[in-house]
A protein has these predicted regions:
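C-terminal, well-structured catalytic/ligand-binding subdomain of enzymes
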Residues: 1-31, 37-39, 54-296
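Charged, often glycine-rich, active-site loop that binds/positions anionic groups
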Residues: 41-52
Length: 296
């Protein structure tokens, strides 16, 4: 526990009081506190497509592709450190994607590389970014400073329309590119079997085509995320699309989308609610064998 505390204090000191409060709420259990630090966690692999619309009203749209049994299925609205944040939760207090009241938006995608190292789970780093930063440049600086335990692509935008893809990894330097979209690989390389199964390059080509179309509208871009190849139906293999989110930083509005429904929330009128979304059955043993594994 002392190692986790030291790492949090060094890299994300503003989160330490909240971490301590959460540990207290959990009864002071040491194992729970260590888990909540997300320091050097077990590897986890997701598939995502995400893009920033840079038109008159900037927005970020993304799909989250993962195993339904490992998904918390919780969207949250918090104000833990004087900043209101809303997004989709992971690891109890981390975020898969989210936006703060200053108009900064961040979303993660696995970077397609198996190499692991010493660092934090990316959901907690995203939480920290949205708790402490106002702009894309500030967020990129934090992502460069705080070590990630695996490779991820983080897409950022803010209410000015500035945007960037920040590629983090435990074994090489962080890169920042002024690109408006990303999927699940870095530098055109990575874990070959995973990239094949998740169609990362195909999804990237589709995003490049959409973003390069001068007639494209934001509404059409969003609809494209509910269609093949960006929308994945590979739930039986653990990489199906579980939700689509759209963040509009100027309006302070978040939308969660599925093919048959949507839920809209905003900072000033966030309404807790519970909905039921049907996803295909979990993978069978034989289907799970077709997924890329750590030994693949």
């Amino acid at each position: 526990l002392s190692i986790c505390r030291k790492a949090l204090t060094r890299y994300m000191p503003e989160l330490v009081p909240t971490w301590e409060r959460l540990g207290h709420l959990a009864g002071g259990n040491v194992r729970v506190a260590r888990m909540l630090s997300l320091y050097c966690p077990a590897p986890y692999v997701v598939g995502c497509s995400q893009a920033v619309w840079t038109g008159s009203e900037p927005l970020l749209v993304r799909n989250y592709d993962y195993h339904p049994d490992a998904f918390e299925g919780v969207a949250v609205h918090t104000q833990w450190n004087d900043t209101r944040v809303m997004g989709v939760s992971d690891c109890l207090w981390g975020l898969l994607d989210g936006m703060n009241e200053h108009g900064l938006v961040a979303a993660l995608a696995f970077g397609g590389r198996r190499d692991g190292g010493v660092g934090f789970g990316i959901p907690l780093i995203l939480r920290y970014v949205l708790e402490t930063c106002h702009t894309v440049d500030e967020a990129a600086a934090v992502l460069d400073r705080v070590p990630s335990h695996m490779s991820y692509n983080v897409l950022l935008t803010d209410r000015t329309g500035d945007h960037a893809v920040v590629a983090v990894a435990p074994d090489r330097s962080t890169t920042v590119e002024r690109r408006a979209f990303c999927t699940n690989h870095q530098d055109g390389t990575g874990w070959a079997r995973y990239l094949e199964v998740t169609r990362s390059f195909e999804r990237e080509r589709r995003l490049e085509s959409l973003m390069g179309d001068p007639a494209m509208t934001s509404a059409e871009l969003i609809r494209s995320f509910l269609k093949d190849p960006l929308y994945s139906k590979e739930h039986a293999r653990g990489f199906g699309t579980l939700y689509t989110t759209v963040y509009r930083p100027r309006a302070g509005r978040m939308s969660c989308l599925w093919p048959d429904r949507s839920v809209d929330q905003d900072f000033d009128d966030y309404e807790p609610q519970e909905i039921e979304v049907e996803t295909p059955d979990s993978p069978t043993d034989s289907q799970a064998e077709s997924r890329p594994s750590e030994s693949a």
